[in-house]
Amino acid sequence: MLTFALVAAAPWIVIPLIALWRARGDPSLDNESPEDTNEAPKVSVVIPARNEGANIAACVQSILMSRYPALEVIVVDDHSVDDTLAIARVMAGFDDRVTALEAPPLPDGWFGKQWACARGADHASGELLCFTDADTRHGHDLMSRSVHRLRSRRLDFVSVLGCQVMLTFWERLIQPQVFAMLSMRFGGAREVNESSNVIDKLANGQYMLLTRAAYDEVGGHASVRDQVAEDLALAQRLFEHGKRTELVEGRNYLSTRMYTSFGTLVRGWMKNIYAGGVRAAPFGWIGRALLPLALLAGPVASLVPIVVLILAAFGLVTKAWLAWSIITTVATFIWWVQVYVRAPVVGPARALRFAAIYPLGSLILAYIIVRAVIRGRRVEWRGREYVAG
């Protein structure tokens, strides 16, 4: 009985261990020196912004406080209905490094973010381009360290993984589960960088730094105009064109609060998880066809042990399955403890509480995935509807 339980439970034990091993030794901006200010190339920071009135001032201010000496900030308002553009214009009036633009009408076949980024790039004068989101906050040395990494390693593209700020119950419960699912697919930054397979390339659209020459050569954002995960698509396109791309940890220098409520969190991941995941599906058309099952595998694997354990409490399964459910539930709980401890949920005690209710998070994640699969390539975001390419 115990032998059966241990053998059957092996995937719940081995797969998390493999995931932890894959995430080891990630490159970090902590190991980079700031760029020499005497040789610093100009960086044009482009911020696409739609209804970001609550964020845009703090984002721009954090960039302007950078120790990097040669930069300009271009805020491109994507037809906001709040005061985003007005705030950006006020900031431009106080600092000549800031430019506030209003994007032209959105053409057919374009996503709003890519259109705004492309228009910002048109106005950029820097040798380097940096695309960042309005909900990010930049540390004083983020620009200097990322530029130094790009130049010292002769890279064409660097994307930084920042700290994901989570303040509400739902953020702390669900966000770590999504990121754990992504780590199961991609591993850590080191593995992404070392892979020679284009579908393994990944970027974080919250901070992407690249040379102007590489951006223009691959066609800029026009080349990924209809992609949900435009960051991943751009990194893959650069790699396909022989450019050197890198993903690097920078949680001490960049922070982002992606979603602020349960509703925005569900809608945001429903937009990205399936339509964006198609580009990263391995094994060609077979992988794309099986993507819904692959996405659901994680949350289902987390839920099955606890379901069997509940059935065992009512005497509905054999002793062998009871033993299996105990082993796998404990293994799954330990996995989620380390996931939540590594996430910024404010201390080990709180991480233990969230790990204890991991089935709720897994159930919600499964719900998000099912809804995303049903919608397919149809995407709704910020009051617009798109069809992903």
Predicted feature residues:
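Membrane-embedded multi-pass helical conduit in multi-pass membrane proteins
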Residues: 291-376
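Catalytic donor/gating beta->alpha subdomain of glycosyltransferases that bind UDP-sugars
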Residues: 150-183, 213-216, 221-287, 386
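Short, acidic, metal-binding catalytic loop of nucleotide-sugar glycosyltransferases
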Residues: 61-70
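A conserved acidic beta->alpha catalytic loop
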Residues: 69, 77-87, 104-105
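Long helical/loop segments within the catalytic core of UDP-sugar-dependent glycosyltransferases
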Residues: 11-19, 99-122, 145-218, 222, ...
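Acidic donor-binding/catalytic loop of UDP-sugar-dependent glycosyltransferases
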Residues: 83, 87, 132-149
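N-terminal membrane-anchoring/stem segments of glycan-assembly enzymes
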Residues: 1-37, 175-176, 188
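Cell-envelope/extracellular polymer assembly enzymes that use nucleotide-activated donors
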Residues: 41-44, 72, 233
